[in-house]
Amino acid sequence: MPMLIQKSEVEYQTISSTQSHLAEEQSERLHRCISKEQLEKLHEAFLNAPERQVGIDDLRVMLEDLDITFNDSMYTRLFLKINQNRDFRVDWNEFVSYLIFGFQEEDPSSQKESLILPISVPPMVRKSEHRSAICCLALLKAKSDQVPIEEVTETVNFSFGGEDSPEASGMWVTASHEGMMRFWTSHMEPIRTASSESIHLNYAFYNNGKVHSKLILGDYAGNVRILSYSPHLRGPFQAKPGAALIEVVWSDVLKGKIPQFVPKEYISLHNEMISCVYFSLHMNALFASAEYRNTKKYRGRCPGMIMVTYDERSNFRIPLGVSTFFVAESHNIVVTGGPDTFVRIWDVYIPTEPSAILTGHNGGIVLVFVQPEENKVYSVDYQKIIKVWDLQEHTLLQTYGDLVRLIHHSETDLTYYYHSHLRELVVAGRKLISIKCCPRVRVDLTDGNTHAAPVSVVLYNRLFRNIVTCGLDSYIIVWDPWTGRRKIIMKSCHTKMIYGEIIDIEITAACFDPLEQFLLTGARDGSLKIWNYNNAVVVRNMSIMPDQEVTSVIWVVDRILAMGWDRQVTEFNDVVGREYGDPKKWPKFHTDDITCADVKLGEGVVTATYSGEIIFWKLETGQPYRRYSVMDPTRFIELKLTAEEEKSLRRSKRLASRPTHTGIHGLQMSRAGRSTVTNRPEDNRDYGANIPISVQAVLFLQTRPQTLKHGSVFISLDTGYIQVYSHHQRGGYMMEFLAVHKTGDCVLTMCTDRKNRFLYTGTAFGYVKIWYIVNFCVPASEKTHVCMPKLRLEFIFLRKELFLTRAKRAIRNQPEPLLVSSYKGHLKAINSIAFINLPKIVFTGSHDYSCRLWTQGGRYLGTLGTVLPWSKLTPFERAGDDSQTYRMPPDIKKVASSTTLKVISGLQAERMVKRQEGKVTEDRDEDTAQTEDVTELKRLLDSPIKEPILGKHFELPGRTVLDQHIELDTSQSYIAVYTHLKVHSTEMLERLPTPAVIGKVQAENYLHHYVPVEGKVDISGSSLNIKQPTRRRSGKTHDPRNIRTAKARLDIGMGLSSSHASQQ
């Protein structure tokens, strides 16, 4: 009895958002305000309590003794959050668990967990267009990857599309052994081809002239040399007049004969060949690595990598040495990989021991790189396997093996390059393969995704004031709609094992318990789970029938109802002590799969099928009392099972009681074989077995009474119409209305507000429509006056326009219900829609992987999971401001109609009204306006059009008068067509003489005009040895071109000698 008294005190309405709240939100999270001393006192109070449990009043007294007070509504909500056992008694474990959950929700690391794998986009493969395999791959950029510390900006995970420009992303350069170079765009589109016979180096300049560029050289003997120079005017690499090639001797650089270079040497830094070098601008340190494969010589105590800072050296000792490494300067870490197949993570200031060792590769590591903003490490081994690791938790996230399929097994000498700006890994060999690694979100194309698959169900929890989304990716995600943060993500919620592999099952239905403390989900394989979604714990597992999809779930007091492709309602107990008993099966009156269902609390349940059947049930007894068909809704259909149905029912019960094999059982219960369960004579198929119209959604209006004149049930059909029924025993079909404006569209989901004033619908084409249903299907005595000016202020859709739009034309002859808003919210179908009463927010879950929030007027608030800043929202104030200009979703902006643009943006284009002399156009009546329009058209169209009608254009030449007839020779087995063609003999064209000036220019060589200038370059004492190009000599001295060339050289020499004489 005390338990019943406490339970009656906590009413269902205490979690409703209709309660009066304070102007500012009063926090219900104790972890923010409770101290350590207060927590110890509470622990003592729980220990002294009887059975170490306290009730709702006792806990409030304990908190008030510690000066922690709440108002009545807030404390009731707090108690329901703490009481996870639903026994209205709280122990110490429940209280501490609630505090821990509060800290977990505020953990920023939960925001970084990705919904999809790091490498989820198929790779882009192109032919290299080289005759041999690519041996070198480089990136030609206008800006270096390293920037000074003062210029480092915060890294964001989205882009506005400008990263594709050559200035930002650069160009790819590939080279092969035959001396061919090819230039590619950032998207691997060929630009040009060049050939070279010299050795190429890859170097970059710092754009900031204050920072000196460094050229780092590592040789076979283990020496590292650094050349530092100023990048101003390209430093020592600028072109010299008259010099085709400049050779620099290293000994002269060390002696300082070239002032542009500042050399520095590290002799015998390693005992083996240098494999990789890197200079960190932020840490002012040099990193150099080498491989030590001779284990007998070095015995594993070799400095695989050495970091040099000024004159200090730090040795990172790694067995077999280091083949490649990556320095993440923002995290002060370095990741190494070598022939020992291990990936090591080091702190640059602790070289004695690695922070973590990542194992899993079966071959030597050839490439490692880090994404600091994503906290991910990528490693590639010799066997072309890519592994992705979490940088903080040091766990394996993904193993990517598509390179083994794309590249031949004999091709092992590959070249890798990671583009940090585009986040692409390019693999070059005989093919060019581009792999996107955690690509940034293009906010110019999309606002991001909520799930990794279509969103199936969206719900609003009034107790915790958060949004729960379920998707076909088997994810359950809890969102805070007021900040846009993701609180909890639960992956692989429904699974099954097939041939030893665990497969995720799509979530198709979900709902909350009456007090909204737990979540019930149904999956495509017929499984049901009850979740304590605050800690991602499964409380209970259930199932309706194997391999039969659950399409709808209902949770009322002490009972759970589930229905789906098994064509009947299954009832589970929700009473303590009887929850694990056998479920109760309601009578099987449906002849096809159940697609949707809804409940009217305390009165009844309505279910609808794929064939258009509708059955009303008593909620208390589970007995049907009315049956309809949407094709003929006014016809009375008797609720009676035929002899064949009864016989089939008895047979199915006998088969269910026998132990059967899994394969045969799954075959019998599959949807493909559903016709075997409903075999009936042809004359008995009257209830919609062959009806093409299916029911997509049903909705009970909770505030309307069960009378004959109140339309309380809305039935959505796939034809685009919504039928209205009365769920009274002597009620039935009342009327229907068209709910779409496009052919082929239909309403897939519906919901209403708390007082059933507005009907919110989501269609298969992605449209959101709002209907005003206060005076729709109610007695005349209950109809109220509609204040249209007030509705026009809230819904811009109702304001008049110059032309009647398509959404309004579709319902111009439909007086009720009143369409108050219509706009395109998604590119794909809307699978679920819900409404938050107090802030007036509509949120929709779509097949395009997103869940979007809208104001009731149609303004776009945001997409859950977006990378953009979130709008300021509160659960106690109405969302939206008429003075604010709202943005549009990028994907909708490209396809939006004028109505969608007006509704989402909240702006209406000014009507251009033509004024005439002495009167205003708006005041004209309809007849006068029609007469003037006809007069204007006559004035434009009655006058003859002036020639030429098409204007001046090119005229085709006329056809020849003579008709050329060709007689074909058909005497042979085939017709020699070419023998009948008239072929004219070619004539030699007269070649015009080449002017003497052009001939002279063709014979010249630009190198003949450049000779060393005395006074600027000292050939004898300088370290720069300028090689003059050898002049070509020809044996044909009588050639006039050679005579002209020799004469030109003589003239140039005389001019130079005279100029020197004048200078002296």
Swiss-Prot record:
SMART domains given in the database record: WD40
Pfam families the record matches: WD40
Keywords, sorted A to Z: Repeat, WD repeat
Keyword Repeat on entry: yes
Gene3D superfamilies on file: EF-hand, YVTN repeat-like/Quinoprotein amine dehydrogenase
PANTHER family named among the record's database cross-references: EF-HAND CALCIUM BINDING DOMAIN 8, WD40 REPEAT DOMAIN 95
Region entry Disordered, spans: 1022-1044
Lineage of producing organism: Eukaryota, Metazoa, Ecdysozoa, Arthropoda, Hexapoda
Domain of life: Eukaryota
WD repeat extents: 150-194, 317-356, 360-399, 450-489, 502-541, 589-629, 742-781, 825-864
Keyword field contains Repeat: yes
Protein name as it appears in the record: WD repeat-containing protein on Y chromosome
